[in-house]
Amino acid sequence: MKKIIATLTAILAMGFSSSFAGTLVINTDLTDPAPKAAFEWAFNKFQEENPDVTIEVNNFDHEGYKQAIRNFLTTSPPDVFNWYAGNRMLPFVRAGLVEDVSDIWSDTGWVDGNLTEGMSHAKKPMTIGGKQWGIPYTYYQWGV
């Protein structure tokens, strides 16, 4: 849990400076209790440290999100959203709906001092055409 919270805090802090003010829109389907609590803690901490930024969270149920993402990315894209890596994100990358975040992967000042080393196992699924299109925030083991 501590690693998730540190990761979330770092992700929210990336790309924001004291000159940024306004609303940060986040679309997600993280409704499970532990991740939801970690995100809420990180959002509250971020807002304490950035009073000029308001976080607007649009939380969808898991199945509804799978349909909604196709609509909101083309009509009213959020600043931040979560999705699957690899082939699941490929259509959105090809359509130009996802921002290249390779610069964050090459930054050595993230959480444990080196995102590339600390999350090297997640880099390949996030890489399309030699660029990274996402930042991992958690890890789920789906099989044994």
Predicted feature residues:
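Hinge/lid segment of periplasmic solute-binding proteins
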Residues: N87-W142
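Short, well-ordered beta-strand elements
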Residues: G22-D32, V53-N58, V80, W133
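Short, polar/charged alpha-helical segment
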Residues: D32-T54
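Short helix-initiation/N-cap motifs at beta->coil->alpha
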Residues: N59-A68
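Bacterial N-terminal signal peptides
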Residues: L8-G15
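Positively charged n-region of N-terminal signal peptides that target proteins for export
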Residues: M1-I4
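Alpha-to-beta junction loops
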Residues: F72-W83
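Sec/Tat signal peptide C-region and signal peptidase I cleavage site
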Residues: F16-A21
